[in-house]
């Protein structure tokens, strides 16, 4: 044993807490020896780390106050998901569901003789429903497993109740959420900024749920020496996602204009997950209408959505979900996703978002990419996240019979293949289309009712997806240690243009809104109309991925290891959009469409009266929450009398 290092010694101890969307990172550095010569008495005894959720056990059933759960992982600093791990001691370890009073213990192995070891410990709040509550925890580092059982008395006057009993050679650097999201200092202060906006989905947040994506994009900075990547997200929409797309989009737009935009911003990209795809769409439309100078000064680069319900979820969900959406169980947002006419006249909001004069701003983007889950996503159906039109026959071949549910019509049509995607040049010149007869077969199948057994399976899929947010099925050890053993994730990657679409039926555009009492077919046709409007004059890159459950959160790697099935998707996103210049990113027809003036009865001027649904300042009562937010508010009222939960 190294001199000066006694048996069963606590080397570091700290107590802290995290609220919704917060995480803390502890960078543990251990100097095994210094200098060029290796000491004769050196030992390779492991260090140990313990993380304990110190929240009172009585808070465990108070789900709408929290839940009071932590995610935590321990990994070597030099761990890379693309490297093969030979030694089992180098494998990362994690706990995705650390409940109140539970503890997580990990070994920090010293299995090689080298001067320095560095480990990273991440501790992330799993709170979903309340901004005020917190999860308390303690972290202990000891020189033996037995040392973690020792009782430690802390000096409450120290910041964060830190009891740093540091041993010579050990240092621990604590990083907060703000530290982790801090923009790296630029090498060249004269560089223009490429602003990358990340937007979270329903009952989610940016700071914790999209942290992995943020760090992976920053790694691409070395491939962009002429610009400075600045990755940001609007944090104040957390716990507000039931209030509607307009509420969320206006908040995001004002955040971009008021807090992020300045003369140093030269480019902008948008990346939205789930509901975030619609939120960023509204924000783009709002900025284009209310601040027309913005997109003249700032070049739009990437519009990316991941598992986003761009067409809503009106015709693919179980009946009990449709009824819940219509009744406002999940607030204004649910009604909008159900294509229900609401506060904006006789048209659903998603239809208004596809107006040609507003969608035209998307044509200015250099790239437009949709990532969609083929299976295992019970929240957002494939047809909605991919804007409906796909080569479904090719997908069926790639899936080998897998479906989201036995009644899913997306894998029943006979569609003529559009072609493979061997390289970009082939895609750019692809003129094939979707066979109209086969498309009718697909669309007709979408109307068919499922049998009772299939309905039960579909319902279970929705419930399972909601449950998997916190109890996500985790990859096995081989997934983390051997990249070659991982199953291919990208099963379809293709550019689609308006000319690829089959011709619409003669009656498709007879009426544009689904009114009370009208048939499900009307809403189905509304989805097709919206999808066609999104394709007007633009090309879309559609990437369909095959992920294991929970695919909806795996696609963004909500948590680094428990959602690791999504690593290849994030790698693809970063490589395709931030590490190389795509020669077909801006086809000429897109540029021409973007440069056309939209004549709106006043000589090309777009007065706000034409977009009152977009720019009108709404009464706060319009943005009503659902049952979850209402219950959470009641819970907040209760906890105000129990300060130990929030102090």
Swiss-Prot record:
Lipid metabolism is among the record's keywords: yes
Disordered: annotated span: 502-523
Location of the active site: 274 (charge relay system)
A GO biological process held by the record: lipid catabolic process
UniProt superkingdom: Eukaryota
Keywords: Hydrolase, Lipid degradation, Lipid metabolism
MF (Gene Ontology): monoacylglycerol lipase activity
EC number: 3.1.-.-
InterPro entries: AB_hydrolase_fold (IPR029058), DUF676_lipase-like (IPR007751), Lipase-like (IPR044294), Rog1_fam (IPR016445)
EC class (word): hydrolase
Xref: PROSITE patterns: LIPASE_SER (PS00120)
Pfam families, per database record: DUF676
Ranges of compositional bias, category Basic and acidic residues: 513-523
Family the UniProt entry places it in: Belongs to the putative lipase ROG1 family.
Note: Present with 195 molecules/cell in log phase SD medium.
Known function: Involved in lipid metabolism.
Protein name in the entry: Putative lipase YDL109C
Organism listed in the record: Saccharomyces cerevisiae (strain ATCC 204508 / S288c) (Baker's yeast)
């Amino acid at each position: 044993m190294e001199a000066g290092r006694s048996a069963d010694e606590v080397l570091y101890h700290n107590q802290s807490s995290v609220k919704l969307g917060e995480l803390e990172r502890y960078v543990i550095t251990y100097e095994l020896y210094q200098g060029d010569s290796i000491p004769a008495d050196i030992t390779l005894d492991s260090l140990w780390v313990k993380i304990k959720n110190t929240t009172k056990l009585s808070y465990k059933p108070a789900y709408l106050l929290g839940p009071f759960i932590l995610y935590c992982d321990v990994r070597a600093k030099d761990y890379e998901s693309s490297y093969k791990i030979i030694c089992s001691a180098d494998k990362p370890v994690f706990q995705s569901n650390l409940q109140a009073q539970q503890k997580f213990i990990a070994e920090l192995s010293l299995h090689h003789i080298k001067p320095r070891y560095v480990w990273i410990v991440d501790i992330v709040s799993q709170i979903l429903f309340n901004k005020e509550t917190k999860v308390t925890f303690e972290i202990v580092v000891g020189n033996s497993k037995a040392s973690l059982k020792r009782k430690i008395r802390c000096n409450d006057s120290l910041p964060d109740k830190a009891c740093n009993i540091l041993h010579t050679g050990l240092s621990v650097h604590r990083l907060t959420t703000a530290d982790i999201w801090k923009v790296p200092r630029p090498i060249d202060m004269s560089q223009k900024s490429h602003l990358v906006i990340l937007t979270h989905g329903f009952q989610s947040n940016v700071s914790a749920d999209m942290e992995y994506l943020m760090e992976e994009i920053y790694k691409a900075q070395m491939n962009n020496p002429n610009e400075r990547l600045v990755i940001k997200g609007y944090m104040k929409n957390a716990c507000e996602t039931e209030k509607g797309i307009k509420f969320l989009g206006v908040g995001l737009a004002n955040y971009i204009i008021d807090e992020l935009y300045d003369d140093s911003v030269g480019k902008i990209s948008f990346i939205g997950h789930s509901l975030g795809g619609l939120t960023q769409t509204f924000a783009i439309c709002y900025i284009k209408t209310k601040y027309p100078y913005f997109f003249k000064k700032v070049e739009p680069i990437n519009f990316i959505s991941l598992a986003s319900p761009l067409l809503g979820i009106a015709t693919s969900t179980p009946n009990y979900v449709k009824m819940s959406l219509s009744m406002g169980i999940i607030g204004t947002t649910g009604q909008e996703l159900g294509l229900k006419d609401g506060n904006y006249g006789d048209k659903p909001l998603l239809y208004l978002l596809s107006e040609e004069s507003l969608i035209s701003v998307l044509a200015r983007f250099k790239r437009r990419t949709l990532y969609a889950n083929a299976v295992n996503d019970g929240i957002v159906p494939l047809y909605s996240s991919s804007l409906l039109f796909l080569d479904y026959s090719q997908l069926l071949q790639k899936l080998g019979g897998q479906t989201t549910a036995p009644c899913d019509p997306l894998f029943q049509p006979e569609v003529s293949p559009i072609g493979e995607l061997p390289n970009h040049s082939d895609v750019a010149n692809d003129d094939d289309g979707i066979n109209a007869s086969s498309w009718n077969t697909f669309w007709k199948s979408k109307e068919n009712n499922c049998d009772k057994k299939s309905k039960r399976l579909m319902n279970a899929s929705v419930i399972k997806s909601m449950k998997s947010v916190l109890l996500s099925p985790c990859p096995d050890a081989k997934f983390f240690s051997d990249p070659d053993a991982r199953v291919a994730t990208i099963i379809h990657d293709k550019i689609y243009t308006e000319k690829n679409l089959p011709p619409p039926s003669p009656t498709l555009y007879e009426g544009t809104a689904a009114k009370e009492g009208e048939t499900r077919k009307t809403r189905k046709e509304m989805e097709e109309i919206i999808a066609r409007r999104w394709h007007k004059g633009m090309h879309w890159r559609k990437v369909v991925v095959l992920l294991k459950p929970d695919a909806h959160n795996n696609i963004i790697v909500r948590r680094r290891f428990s959602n690791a099935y999504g690593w290849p998707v994030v790698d693809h996103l970063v490589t395709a959009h931030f590490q190389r210049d795509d020669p077909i990113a801006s086809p000429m027809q897109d540029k021409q469409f973007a440069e056309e003036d939209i004549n709106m009865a006043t000589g090309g001027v777009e007065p706000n009266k034409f977009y009152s649904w977009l720019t009108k300042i709404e009464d706060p009562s319009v943005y009503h929450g659902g049952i979850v937010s209402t219950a959470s508010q009641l819970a907040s009222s209760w906890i105000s009398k129990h300060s130990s939960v929030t102090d």
